[in-house]
């Protein structure tokens, strides 16, 4: 066994000297196992740099409290490896693939894969495009998701990214019954705990593997936990031919963790203090999330937008990799419209007549045109009032407000907070509902009847109650 000794500790970054002249390879896992009067220590490091002839600089995967210079370190000879396959379903893991739930250890013979690997070769990639129905009206109509695509949920703090992810897990697991992998990257432990219990209660957990490296973990764990989840998803895709859903909450924390260790590793910061390797790190992760001839990975990633600034390098780099974006807007939460998805800023490459069909495409574009015109008229309304508008513009405003409210709906996962039953709306019902609103079929119904409902039949029911 190749052994070395700790020579320097800088928080999560540790230097290790190997005297034998044989340095561990980049990405190799090094371990420390020792006992002293303060208890036992079991640490894993990952090699990041070679310094000179005999020293490596490593990043710790857990807290380095209590570690001292001179401690013996062992080279495992391979990268961090995590359990994969059916044994992972229904379980919760940390970045190293250790089970952290209360269901005991995994069987000793469980198969393990290294977390670092190459993206699939060009000729292995699949090119077919198929829509993934989510049951969420605003998403299915205006920025539909692609099976095997990459989807980003963009938004600032507290606008509902995690709730939207939880609803997608619930809807897709209930309706499509596929396997899901959830990677909690640098987010709140409470949310992870809530999600685990909700999924246990609904039975969805049996088809899900969960991996967590939360806010309180050192940056090494937060940077690598997304790769741990991805490795588990890749096994289901490549070895079992499954269509897998990979949820990452939050991909910004992956970048943030990289920037935390970057300066300690001796790299010169680039724009806004981010690591110079930002685009490379993001590319290495994102290129592995793809569909092959064997199966698909559809990934849904929450992207925190610092200070609501979309030009920040972290969200801007993420944009380049996505097939669809769902933008959450604080202005809509203030109006009580949930999910607070911006219908004009959200995009999808699937919104074309060849993929969604002529009718769906036409209805979606008309909805966007109506909302865009309403947005343009809002300044005039604020200054001069509604009465100064032409009859045609009054009708646009009248319908746009109904459309805006009809884009909202109650979520199953928010039932305990709202007391309202959640709704799942099939795409064809969504398209026909908006088509009828655009045609003026419901111009006589009160605006509030359209708020937080599922299908158009609920609107009619609400209107009857209001008029009674």
UniProtKB/Swiss-Prot annotation:
Q: Under which EC number(s) is this enzyme classified?
A: 7.1.2.2
Where does the protein end up? Cell membrane
Reactions that this protein is recorded to catalyse: ATP + H2O + 4 H(+)(in) = ADP + phosphate + 5 H(+)(out)
Name the Gene3D superfamilies on file.
2.40.10.170, Bovine Mitochondrial F1-atpase, Atp Synthase Beta Chain, Chain D, domain 3, P-loop containing nucleotide triphosphate hydrolases
Q: Topologically, how does it sit relative to the membrane?
A: Peripheral membrane protein
InterPro entries reported for this sequence? AAA+_ATPase, ATP-synt_VA_C, ATP_synth_F1_bsu, ATPase_a/bsu_AS, ATPase_alpha/beta_chains, ATPase_F1/V1/A1_a/bsu_N, ATPase_F1/V1/A1_a/bsu_N_sf, ATPase_F1/V1/A1_a/bsu_nucl-bd
- The residues the record assigns to binding ATP are 155-162
Q: What class of enzyme is it?
A: translocase
A GO cellular component term found in this entry reads: proton-transporting ATP synthase complex
Q: Which domain of life is it from?
A: Bacteria
Q: Name one GO molecular function term.
A: ATP binding
Q: What is its main location?
A: membrane
Annotated signal sequence is none
A Pfam entry, by short name: ATP-synt_VA_C
Q: Which NCBIfam families does this UniProt record tie to the protein?
A: atpD
Function summary: Produces ATP from ADP in the presence of a proton gradient across the membrane. The catalytic sites are hosted primarily by the beta subunits.
Name the family the entry cites. Answer: Belongs to the ATPase alpha/beta chains family.
Q: How does it assemble?
A: F-type ATPases have 2 components, CF(1) - the catalytic core - and CF(0) - the membrane proton channel. CF(1) has five subunits: alpha(3), beta(3), gamma(1), delta(1), epsilon(1). CF(0) has three main subunits: a(1), b(2) and c(9-12). The alpha and beta chains form an alternating ring which encloses part of the gamma chain. CF(1) is attached to CF(0) by a central stalk formed by the gamma and epsilon chains, while a peripheral stalk is formed by the delta and b chains.
Q: Which PANTHER family match?
A: ATP SYNTHASE, ATP SYNTHASE SUBUNIT BETA, MITOCHONDRIAL
Record protein name field: ATP synthase subunit beta
The record lists the organism as Bacillus cereus (strain ATCC 14579 / DSM 31 / CCUG 7414 / JCM 2152 / NBRC 15305 / NCIMB 9373 / NCTC 2599 / NRRL B-3711)
């Amino acid at each position: 066994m190749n052994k070395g000794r700790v020579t320097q500790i800088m928080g999560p970054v540790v230097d290790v000297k190997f005297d034998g002249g044989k340095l561990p390879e980049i990405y190799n896992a090094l371990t420390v196992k020792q006992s002293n009067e303060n208890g036992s220590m079991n640490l894993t490091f990952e090699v990041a740099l070679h310094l000179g002839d005999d020293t490596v600089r490593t990043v710790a995967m857990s807290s380095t409290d209590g570690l001292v210079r001179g401690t013996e370190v062992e080279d495992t000879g391979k990268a961090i490896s995590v359990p994969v396959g059916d044994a992972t379903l229904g379980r919760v893991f940390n970045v190293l693939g250790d089970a952290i739930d209360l269901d005991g250890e995994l069987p000793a013979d469980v198969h393990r894969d290294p977390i670092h690997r190459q993206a699939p070769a060009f000729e292995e990639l699949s090119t077919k495009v198929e829509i993934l129905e989510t049951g969420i009206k605003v998403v299915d109509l205006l920025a539909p998701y692609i099976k095997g695509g990459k989807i980003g949920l963009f938004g600032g703090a507290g606008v509902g990214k995690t709730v939207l992810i939880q609803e997608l897990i619930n809807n897709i697991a209930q309706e499509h019954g596929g396997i899901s992998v959830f990677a909690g990257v640098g987010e709140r432990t409470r949310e992870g705990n809530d999600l685990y219990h909700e999924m246990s209660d609904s039975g969805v957990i049996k088809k899900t593997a969960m991996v967590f490296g939360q806010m309180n973990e050192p940056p090494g764990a937060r940077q690598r936990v997304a790769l741990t989840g991805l490795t588990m998803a890749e096994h289901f895709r490549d070895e079992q031919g499954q269509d897998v859903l990979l949820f990452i909450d939050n991909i910004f924390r992956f970048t943030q963790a990289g920037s935390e260790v970057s300066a300690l590793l001796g790299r010169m910061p680039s724009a806004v203090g981010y690591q110079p390797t930002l685009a490379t790190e993001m590319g290495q992760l994102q290129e592995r999330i793809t569909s092959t001839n064997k199966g698909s990975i559809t990934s849904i990633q929450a992207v925190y937008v610092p200070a609501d600034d979309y030009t920040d390098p972290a969200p801007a780099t993420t944009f380049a990799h996505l097939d669809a974006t769902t933008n959450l807007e604080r202005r809509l939460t203030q109006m009580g419209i949930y999910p607070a998805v911006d219908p004009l800023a959200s995009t999808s490459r699937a919104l074309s007549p060849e993929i969604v069909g002529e009718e769906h495409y036409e209805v979606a574009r008309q909805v966007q045109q109506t909302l865009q015109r309403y947005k343009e008229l809002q300044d005039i309304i604020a200054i001069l009032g509604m009465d100064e508008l032409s009859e045609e513009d009054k009708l646009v405003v009248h319908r746009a407000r109904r459309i805006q409210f009809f884009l909202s709906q109650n979520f199953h996962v928010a039932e305990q907070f709202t007391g309202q039953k959640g709704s799942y709306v099939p795409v064809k019902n969504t398209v026909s509902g908006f088509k009828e609103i655009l045609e003026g079929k419901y111009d006589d119904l009160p605006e509030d009847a359209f708020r937080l409902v599922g299908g158009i039949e609920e609107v009619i029911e609400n209107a009857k109650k209001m008029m009674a």
